[in-house]
Amino acid sequence: PGLAVLPGSPVDNVARERYSTVYMPGGKITMLPDEVVQVYTLLEGRDCPALSLYLDVSRDFIVTGNESRIERVPVVANLRHHDIEPVFNETTLVEGGPDFPWKAELTLLWELATVLEAGRGTPAANQNMVDFNFSVDWNEITPDGPGKIEIGRRSRGSPLDKLVAELMIAANSTWGKALSNAGIPAL
């Protein structure tokens, strides 16, 4: 959404007041107003405005080039951690596991992420850490009032964590370098 927000505009002022998105169990307060977020959210079955980074990658997963585009991207599927991790994890990568939608694509991206991580010379610091998933079912009434809270453990450093982290690092470092080369300060 940042490309569509003009400095000093009412939306920019709201974002500056809120400063960041706040995440909490069962909800969040977005930095941008909901009507702006809804234009960019990755809802399945629609085309969303996006700043895309395309990487040219050799057969041995070496990045040989890149291209950035402002475009509309068709969202064919919105893959969620809690749906993917049971079928895409350390065990299924080693043993093969059952087929599932996007398995080949996720495996290919995981292989790229592994090479990107090795190229940085920095293994993930969170390999053996535990994280938690929180959810609140506001439709369920409990003795304490509305909202049943569920907290589940999940291991950090999973193949999906690595895939997301390494591709975000690649995007941030690629765009950071481009901004630096152009003499443009940015956060």
Describe the residue ranges of each PLM region:
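Electropositive polyanion-binding surfaces
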Residues: 1-187
